[in-house]
């Protein structure tokens, strides 16, 4: 076992750099725990506010004897022109703060360099979020291998790789509505330019930041991916080949949350009493509930949220609807009460205003569908729980994930969203799916057609394969072993 080797011959020390956004930090904390369970000393470097988000989960891990420590560095907000209190990506109130935020984050290079000079034992490896290109300079200065973590699936990473190698494909498109086929792909898949992450050119300082991110990607030693071989074998194999063998699929990392409290508080403490939520679910028939959650950075316009609510109501099916970023949705709260919506659906609709215990909900036998924004964490959690998906992508890698879920894996139904919802421009787009469209999509997912039954069967099988992948002897468990052996050989050859 690698854990025995690391203790006896060479103590490995990994330093983890999560990006300051909820969807990026959650899996990175899981990765920290997975590696610590193998005897690797883990140091997580983050800012005070972000450290506080994971205090409970990490305290339990440390109390159980896992060798994890957190080092806090102050974000130089003022120096970067960022107003105080904007320590997380999901707390930014406007697009104008995006560049100052990234500037502040990458100004951490100097304090982190000082940390590395004093660290003991000397770090053997850096695992960095791809949004933190400054960690490449740290890795180079201290001659330490840097492993990248994107938080995306192999399907999406391979798509980005192919398009960067064949830039003329995007350059030759006549408009943002024109579709193109991704070449050299195991399946025929079409996209428009805005649907592909990092594909559109943005002028000025943001372009420079993106170029730094791409360059740091190219020069990293390898990549770890939160997926499992059995989920997307052709894409995992092709992406590994594209990375010269240095790509390790180690997921689903969420499965390290075996304790109920860890599942309930993964990412944030829930804004609903866990027992109240489970009691409500217990009262519903098996497979009857649709769980609706559009992520931590969803800011659909009020007009669209109303149509979603009315469609859920007209579907006549029980549902849980999570509205995060609640303070930004005061108008929706008013509509819930003023229109009578909350009163009308109270017997079969549970509204969670804030953070939900998502893993506990998805694992419950009464849940039979998941309406998701297709962020990779949520997508993978749904599949891992054996729940078919109703896809409603917004931006980033989410359209890639939808294509994988609906067209390749055939475990989901599209709500019909084709247009990218650019952050800060939601009102311009307006309603993309009306209440009839919502009702129809819910019926297609939750109904009793042959296709619906086949989707349920397929996703349950993929869920079982996920559980096997992380067990000893499984593909992801073995890949962690392989990664640690690789880094250990490097560490020994450097000393």
Swiss-Prot record:
One function term, GO molecular function aspect: UDP-glucosyltransferase activity
Enzyme class: transferase
Gene3D superfamilies: Glycogen Phosphorylase B
EC number, as in UniProt: 2.4.1.368
Parts forming coiled coils: none
Catalytic activity entry: oleanolate + UDP-alpha-D-glucose = oleanolate 3-O-beta-D-glucoside + UDP + H(+)
Binding site for UDP-alpha-D-glucose: 358, 373, 376-378, 381, 397-398
Pfam families according to UniProt: UDPGT
PROSITE patterns cross-referenced by the UniProt entry: UDPGT
Binding positions (an anthocyanidin): 24, 396
Alphabetical GO biological process terms: saponin metabolic process
Keyword entries, A-Z: Glycosyltransferase, Transferase
Catalytic residues, chain numbering: 24 (proton acceptor), 129 (charge relay)
Source organism superkingdom: Eukaryota
UniProt function note: The monoglucosylated hederagenin 3-O-beta-D-glucoside is a feeding deterrent of the yellow-striped flea beetle (Phyllotreta nemorum).
Family, per entry: Belongs to the UDP-glycosyltransferase family.
Name of the molecule in the record: UDP-glycosyltransferase 1
Originating organism: Barbarea vulgaris (Yellow rocket)
